[in-house]
UniProtKB/Swiss-Prot annotation:
EC number of the protein: 2.1.1.33
UniProt protein name: tRNA (guanine-N(7)-)-methyltransferase
General function of this protein: Catalyzes the formation of N(7)-methylguanine at position 46 (m7G46) in tRNA.
Database matches in InterPro entries: SAM-dependent_MTases_sf, tRNA_(Gua-N-7)_MeTrfase_Trmb, tRNA_methyltr_TrmB_bact
Organism in which the protein naturally occurs: Cereibacter sphaeroides (strain ATCC 17023 / DSM 158 / JCM 6121 / CCUG 31486 / LMG 2827 / NBRC 12203 / NCIMB 8253 / ATH 2.4.1.)
Active site: D150
Keywords: Methyltransferase, S-adenosyl-L-methionine, Transferase, tRNA processing
Binding sites annotated in the UniProt record for substrate: K154, D186, T219, R220, Y221, E222
A GO CC term assigned to this protein in UniProt: tRNA methyltransferase complex
Binding site for S-adenosyl-L-methionine: E76, E101, D128, D150
Catalytic activity entry: guanosine(46) in tRNA + S-adenosyl-L-methionine = N(7)-methylguanosine(46) in tRNA + S-adenosyl-L-homocysteine
Pfam family name, one: Methyltransf_4
Database matches in Gene3D superfamilies: Vaccinia Virus protein VP39
Length: 241
């Protein structure tokens, strides 16, 4: 599916200022008819207004109290097919969870899972997480997840990884003091870079392990990694302050 075939609410959703490059795919396989229905019927009510530069050129902060009724706010960065995000929302009904994912097919998969699970404490930004960082109030998020991010394996592309200061600085700004940041990856060099870069952004390392968190839901990507002999690694950081 081309960008021109995407619903209006997705076209240009990740566009930021002219200097903000976006790397990675926005769409993949042709969407199933049911997925097109999810996008057309459900995305509009689950997508907060005021995140994109077109909707909010002044970059006014979001009113999270209005969006989530004063509940603690969690953030998932790049939710993939959405299984972990829906699992966390169902397990923690007293929180509000925002997920970011620029890949149209992943957004459609998440919307289907939301319908099936009946969870109501989720919102979706179908675009670049940096646009969301722009408008999240300072110290407003109490937990963030980064699960199996794009590894960008070529050395010349390592600067595109999320665990660089260009992403981690804005993340640190929106996380409250003491907030948790969890990272899961099966790429050894991504582990190395995460352990080097995240503390430089104002985080303390809490744990690193080959054993998953107690509330973890293994994703499709993780199962594929295990079948192919790769070893998952789980890291937990705490925002300083």
């Amino acid at each position: 599916m081309s960008d021109d075939d995407a619903p209006e609410s997705l076209r240009g959703a990740a566009d930021g200022p002219a200097w903000r490059n976006f790397y990675g795919r926005r769409s993949g396989k042709t969407l199933r008819p049911s997925q097109k229905v999810y996008l057309s019927e459900d995305l509009g009510r689950l997508r907060p207004e005021g995140i994109t530069r077109e909707e909010n050129p002044e970059r006014r902060p979001l009113d999270l109290g209005a969006l989530f009724g004063g509940r603690p706010v969690w953030l998932e960065i790049g939710f993939g097919g959405g299984e972990h995000m829906v699992h966390m929302a169902a397990r923690n009904p007293g929180i509000g969870l925002i997920g970011c994912e620029p890949f149209v097919n992943g957004v459609a998969m998440l919307l289907g899972k939301i319908r099936a699970a009946g969870v109501e404490n989720l919102l979706v930004h179908p675009g670049d997480v940096r646009d969301l960082f722009d408008v999240l109030p300072e110290a407003s998020v109490s937990k963030a997840f980064l699960n199996y991010p794009d590894p960008w394996p070529k050395k010349r592309h390592h600067r595109r990884r999320f665990v660089t200061q260009g992403y981690l600085g804005p993340l640190a700004r929106v996380l409250a003091p003491g907030a948790t940041f969890r990272v899961a990856t099966d790429i050894p060099d991504y582990v190395r870079q995460t352990l080097e870069e995240v503390p430089q952004a104002g985080f303390d390392l809490v744990s690193e392990s080959g054993e998953a968190w107690e509330d973890w839901l293994s994703t499709r990507y993780e199962q594929k990694a295990l079948r192919e002999g790769r070893v998952p690694h789980y890291m937990t950081f705490r925002r300083q302050g």
